[in-house]
Amino acid sequence: MGINRRQFLQNSSAFLSACAMGTGLSAVSEALQAQANKSRIELLGSYWTFSGSAIPHSDREYSSFDFRDRVEAMAKRGFTGMGIWHADLAHILETRSLKEMKQILDDNGIRHVELEFINDWFVEGEARVQSDKTRALLLEAAETLSARHIKVGDFEGKTTPMPVLIESFAKLCADAANAGTRVVFELMPISMINTLADTLTMLEGANAANGGMILDTWHVFKIGIPFAEIARIPLRFLLGVELNDGYLKAPEGMTIQEETTGHRQFCGEGEFDLKGFLAALARTGYDGPYGIEILNLNLRAWPLDRAVEHAYTTTLAQFSG
């Protein structure tokens, strides 16, 4: 992909400034390379980061910000991807069609669409009935919106035999393939699969070309996955990445559910070694977009533009130095 006019001017300015200050050519070259690397990073605004006053796991999960406003604000700042939660999608569809949503996304250059979240896709009974409704909604949307992937997982640690998980995941991937999209399993410390090894076992067993995992740094650091293990993840299974920061150890009295839904932090503002994580990730060959998923009680009151600006700049800063 060729460099665009803006990047050319930025690089030229950086070169001239460095020369004026007497900086050595090798240092100038390194600075320009770092700037070029940052220009290739694609950021995806995960749903909860820009959902306004929406509250996870409640009956008010839809965003307080209009869909078009979110798309335009993210695109203006440089995002090329956007996440949409199932309850928010249903809310949007009360006033807009999927075709209209697609047009808004296309008009603003948002080419990476993430849909979430399917829970209980591996169980039976009433929970599965509700899960299948979400599944149908997201699959229909994925086809029209040309979604990059659909996120799935488990929030309740519902212990399930591996053969059942493999069969269920394979079927989910088959349904997604018919809709032209992929399925990414989000590994969490609170899910029925909470180790990288078991995640890979499920993915290998399902053996679906469109099935893989998404790594969220909050879950990676809470589980304690070594960077060496991350570096060895087969690229064919690594279909998505989400970045955020947080506490290595939760404050006393705070549950993991409270922490993950209300106390995540922007990149560089917590205790995670994000640059170490990114270095390990680079060894896998991952070159897809990076989601930014911040669930924070204070963030719910922020204006949209402030949230977009802060999320973008703090995340991009992790790719330098």
Question: Predicted regions span which residues?
Answer:
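N-terminal pre-domain/capping segments
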Residues: 2-143, 177, 208-212, 235-238, ...
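Acidic/histidine-rich catalytic cores of soluble enzymes
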Residues: 81-82, 171-271, 278
